[in-house]
From Swiss-Prot:
Homodimer. It comes from the Bacteria. Catalyzes the acyloin condensation reaction between C atoms 2 and 3 of pyruvate and glyceraldehyde 3-phosphate to yield 1-deoxy-D-xylulose-5-phosphate (DXP). Its cofactor is Mg(2+); thiamine diphosphate. Pathway: Metabolic intermediate biosynthesis; 1-deoxy-D-xylulose 5-phosphate biosynthesis; 1-deoxy-D-xylulose 5-phosphate from D-glyceraldehyde 3-phosphate and pyruvate: step 1/1. The keyword Mitochondrion does not apply. The lineage of its organism: Bacteria, Pseudomonadati, Pseudomonadota, Gammaproteobacteria, Oceanospirillales. It holds the Pfam family Transket_pyr. Belongs to the transketolase family. DXPS subfamily. SMART domains: Transket_pyr (SM00861). This is 1-deoxy-D-xylulose-5-phosphate synthase.
Length: 643
């Protein structure tokens, strides 16, 4: 086997890719011979390195599936055959080979290519993804649809070993076997977490298991032995024993799949041969390929976590989120430090995360308190109910989770935590617009779906110090509590070193002006204060979404002509809706302007670009207020004082 060339550095200049430059669709790829396919894989890896270096983006996963991507588009008739990528981090080579090569420098940028497969972007993107573990269910649906329509097309799901830890993946596997649909599930095992048994014998056996001859012989033998149950059982046990010597596929065989593998995911000729054999088979098939994340780039091979994604090269690559510490700490850093500090004070604290140790800044906690740290893998539902069980018996669980992923555990949040009024603190990271990853990762809805749950305490800090104090407040609260904070850095507020808490339901008057009051919920406070200084508005940092500071709202409503609510959450059902509901309950009718995320999915781009697009930057806020004041025939006052 020809081994992939290992790059030592990311190309700064566009590499010479004469073969790749001629490939604008997989149909052209299928005209190549074996030697040309190997050359194409090399050029594809070189171009992927170059393009991500120029734009920034997900890195290691795509490098690891170059050969698999080429083989899939060569063996199958895409897009007629449905190819579904799980999560989508590994789909960059797929995008390059399906007519988007020249657009790759725009990936994750405003109005450019999306970070993940999107149905709106290409017919080759058969299913939109971003969250994990959805591919098998989606591909199974496509396989069943093909059968209902009497169409011969194939359905293929490519899923990583990390995504296979989620319950949804096993739900789909269990159902797939029952349907007997023509579905191929490819396990991209890039951590060797299921098996290390890769070599000549297993490769040979994989080819045998995938061959049409073997499967015809097996089916014919079963028919012959149907009348002799004892011989049938002996044959079954012999086959299972043979497979068990070289393949770890017992689980998948028991689920009803024909298991094939493991095979080397970087052996392109072997992949093509195996896939060509598999596509002739009927029923659920399971192919286990072993790959190396970051394959072909030395630094990524040695540090696959650090090189999961990179920033744009300027002029040398910086590993995303692992470069020199910023002058101002990230909100996640504030949480990570608070968690360690609180754990030192309270031995009952337990930290839980669904596979977000690095992103949620739990690394230090996991090292210092390993017996109280639980990474449950990609299993958000389990994470929340695990926390509920801990809380039932005296532990104090803290669930560190991204806003977008908490959506996946909504029933557990209500049924297992809130109804029982259990002491669980949710540290909700990536609230609001997260930027380049787009709508699948935006934290646009948490205030809305949390606010309607009884017993919940909900807080949104405006700076670093409030974040720390709110975490303490939520931790000490009797019942479920949530602190939602954005991605990135805060404004640079001084942080109190202790473990102080806030008075529950108490807002903070930040600036006293006249006529118009901005009730701010969360991290948009600096923009609100800037607008208020220009126009002499009052600004209140509300802090608490539930319970609201009702006395503050009544005071502001009685002394101002226009009330503005500001939040980085969808307007529908958000914090502003809570203010309006309270005013209505008090029989107060007054002009209220709700500023927040519109009723649409916000596409990818830099956070500053997106804030401007939706009118949540300082200028957009000022313009919206000015427009409303004009409609009310009110003029802006010009003097005021900070509170």
């Amino acid at each position: 086997m020809q081994k992939p060339y290992v790059f030592q550095e990311i190309p700064v200049h566009r590499p010479n890719t004469p073969l790749l430059d001629k490939i604008d669709s997989p149909a052209q790829l299928r005209l190549l011979n074996e030697a040309e396919l190997l050359q194409l894989a090399h050029e594809l890896r070189a171009f992927l390195l170059y393009s991500v270096g120029q734009s920034g983006g997900h890195f290691g996963a795509g490098l690891g599936v170059v050969e698999l991507t080429v083989a899939l588009h060569y063996a199958f008739n895409t897009p007629e055959d449905r190819l579904v990528w799980d999560v989508g981090h590994q789909a960059y080579p797929h995008k390059i080979l399906t007519g988007r090569r020249e657009q790759m420098l725009t990936i994750r940028q405003k109005d450019g290519l999306a970070a993940f497969p999107r149905r709106e972007e290409s017919p080759y993107d058969t299913f939109g993804v971003g969250h994990s573990s959805t591919s098998i269910s989606a591909a199974l649906g496509m396989a069943i649809a093909a059968r209902l329509q009497n169409q011969p097309r194939k359905a293929i799901a490519v899923i990583g070993d990390g995504a296979m830890t989620a319950g949804m993946a096993f739900e789909a596997l269990n159902h797939a076997a029952d349907t007997k649909a023509d579905l191929l599930v490819i396990l991209n095992d890039n951590d060797m977490s299921i098996s290390r048994n890769v070599g000549g014998l297993s490769n040979y056996f994989a080819r045998l298991l995938a061959s049409k001859t073997y499967n015809q012989m097996r089916d014919s033998g079963k028919r012959v032995l149907q009348g002799a149950p004892s011989l049938m059982e002996l044959a079954r046990k012999t086959e299972e024993h043979f497979k068990g010597m070289v393949a770890p596929g017992t689980l998948f065989e028991e689920l009803g799949f024909n298991y094939i593998g493991p095979i080397d995911g970087h052996d392109l000729p072997r992949l093509v041969e195996t896939l060509n054999n598999i596509k002739e088979l009927n029923g659920p098939q399971f192919l286990h390929v072993v790959t190396k994340k970051g394959k072909g780039f030395a630094h990524a091979e040695s540090d696959p976590i650090g090189y999961h994604a990179i920033n744009k090269i300027e002029p040398k690559p910086k590993v995303q989120d692992t470069a020199k510490a910023p002058k101002k700490p990230r909100y996640s850093n504030i949480f990570g430090q608070w968690l360690c500090d609180m754990a030192e004070q309270d031995a009952s604290l337990v930290g839980i995360t669904p596979a977000m140790c690095e992103g949620s800044d739990l690394i230090e906690f996991s090292k210092r308190f390993p017996e109280r740290y639980y990474d449950v893998a990609i299993a958000e539902q389990h994470a929340v109910t695990l926390a509920a069980g801990l809380a039932c018996d005296g532990a104090k669980p803290v669930v560190a989770i991204y806003s977008t992923f908490l959506q996946r555990a909504y029933d557990q949040l209500i049924h297992d935590v809130a109804i029982q009024n259990l002491d669980v603190l949710f540290a909700i990271d990536r609230a609001g617009l997260v930027g380049e990853d787009g709508p699948t990762h935006a934290g646009s809805f948490d205030l809305t779906f949390l606010r309607c749950i009884p017993n919940m305490l909900i807080m949104a800090p405006s700076d670093e110090d409030e974040t720390r104090k709110m975490l303490t407040t939520g931790y000490q609260y009797t019942g479920p509590a949530a602190v939602r904070y954005p991605r990135g850095n805060g404004p640079g507020a001084d942080i109190s070193p202790g473990l102080e808490s806030l008075e529950i339901g108490k807002a903070n008057l930040r600036r006293r002006g006249a006529q118009t009051v901005i009730l701010n919920f969360g991290a948009l406070l600096p923009a609100a204060l800037g607008v208020a200084e220009e126009s002499n508005f009052t600004v209140v940092d509300m802090r608490f979404i539930k319970p609201l500071d009702q006395n503050m709202i009544l005071e502001m409503a009685g002394s101002h002509d226009l009330l503005v609510t500001l939040e980085e959450n969808c307007i529908l059902g958000g914090a502003g809706s809570g203010v309006i509901e309270f005013l209505a309950s008090q029989g107060i009718a007054m002009p209220v302007l709700q500023l927040g995320l519109p009723d649409e999915f916000i596409e990818h781009g830099k956070p500053a670009e997106l804030h401007k697009e939706v009118g949540l930057d300082a200028q957009g806020i000022a313009n919206a207020i000015k427009k409303r004041l004009k409609s009310l025939n009110l003029a802006s006052p010009k003097t005021g004082t900070s509170a």
